[in-house]
Structures are given as C-alpha cells and as structure tokens.
C-alpha cells in the first residue's frame, strides 16, 4: 500500500501557514499549495473582491470546493489553508480524513504584529484589529483543536525550528 503524505496547516491569520508550509514542503520534498492562492488564480480576482461580492459565505463555499478539488487531484502535498477554512464542517472532515493536520498556534499579539500592514485580509479591513482577532480566535480555536493531530506554538520560534518540530512529529507518526 502506498502511503499518502498529505500535511495540512491550519491556524489563525499571521500564524505563518504559508511561510512555514513552503519551507516544510521544501524540506520534505513535497509540493506546497496555498488554498488562498489557488482560489485567486481560479477566480481571476483577489479574495477581498470575492468577499465584497459574495460575502464570507460565498467565499467559504469556493474555499471548500477548491480544497476538495486539490485533495481529489493531488497527493503528497503540504497545504496551507485559509484561517477560516475550518469553519466549514465538510472542509474539516476532508482535512482530518486525508492527512495529518498541524495547528499552528499564534497569540493575538503575534497576529497583530504580523498583520499590521496587511491589506489583503478581508476580515481585518478595520482600524482596530484586536477585537476582530479576539472574536475570530474565540470562534475558531475549538475548531482548530478539534481536528489537529498536533499543535505547534509559533510564538518566538524560528521558521526552521517550527519546521523541525513538525518533521519530528511526522516521523513519530510514521508518515515520513
């Protein structure tokens, strides 16, 4: 039996899913995919535009469809999901049943620091991001934890250190 090595990175905005995912994929010699990039490429517009036109519900539907398509077409990948991908029950089920789910945990302070100048995140187009981030974490943290095979704290850690922690976990789980 050929074992599929799918690794899914979940977590809040600013946790480093894309940055860590690229390095993890490079180290493990797997393909890296960012679901937000795939959505933008497929739709031909940026995520802000989709949110403005279709709202969050429309975006989440597209996100679920794209993740489902990726998992139907690809194996042996590192997939960085959007921070809210776990809001959809079908997406949670897909991720938890098709690979190892790594929850990259980040504090509100870290999220604020990493998103302070970012204008590409539709839910953070506000003057005071802290209350929004706090609300998002209150809603999403239980969902992240519910499907995570491992939780990796990203605060104060280097990308290399985080990648090594994930790799160690994957070896212990015999996925590598």
From Swiss-Prot:
Q: Which InterPro entries match?
A: P-loop_NTPase (IPR027417), Shikimate/glucono_kinase (IPR031322), Shikimate_kinase/TSH1 (IPR000623), Shikimate_kinase_CS (IPR023000)
Q: Which GO terms describe its cellular component?
A: cytosol
Q: What is its main location?
A: cytoplasm
Q: Which cofactors, if any, are listed as required? A: Mg(2+)
Q: Which Pfam families match?
A: SKI
Q: What is its EC number?
A: 2.7.1.71
Where is substrate bound in this sequence? Answer: 36, 60, 83, 140
Record's subunit section: Monomer.
Q: What is this protein called?
A: Shikimate kinase
Task: Identify the gene encoding this protein.
Answer: aroK
